[in-house]
Amino acid sequence: MESIEDKALETYSKNIEYFSKNHKELMKLLTTLDIAINTGDYEPRYDLEYIDGYFDIKDIKTGAYVYNGNSLNISKDISRLVDFKKNKRTFEGFPIYTFSDEQVEKAGGITKLVAGVLPMTRYYFEHSDQKGTMKEINKFIFVGVRLGLHIPIIHEKIKSAEYLIIEDDLEIFKLSLFTTQYYTLAQDATLYFSVADDENLFLKTTRLYLRDTFYENRYLKYVLFPTYPTNKLKQIQNSIMTQSFI
């Protein structure tokens, strides 16, 4: 029987192969981190530990754990937060124009762009349930990866075609390569990664995610990892509001 350690190393190796071929810039960051650790220029802050049947991330200096409990059960709890409701954990990816004829007249007319979509958006607004449920979730955002154990569980639940995966800590993301099979997920969906990005790079990545298949951006569902900083939600909203066609 394959040991836990062997399975983790195999997962890591296949992930590295996947990133080397498909996400070269992220692979450069991971390689740079490895070199810095091996040369002693960077002292690792975190360690991956296997405790009573589950993995956790240990802060080497403080001894604190990121999950501080059964990470498998916690990941299942996170997956239960995800639903198909339009008004829960959702970004609205583009506006719905609902101007009345009177409002248009008072404004002195509308631009050609808005004029072209106004009849369609009016129809959509009048004939759709803005607080109902979605039949499918085609694009989804993971805000905070940690070990990524919740990612495949949520994918099994929603089967999205595109995922934006966000993690600010490169060292923690590297640990997730031992526990989460990104290479398997990539067989079912298109993956966008924002890892250790500054604000400019984050904006660039999110704009790419929003631009491709922009017609699927009406409702963008997301899940925020517990204890993960909420400032990324505001940055995502800023990216949405600065799309070129809004």
Segments the model singles out, each with a brief description of its role:
Residues 1-246:
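N-terminal donor/sugar-recognition subdomains of glycan-related enzymes
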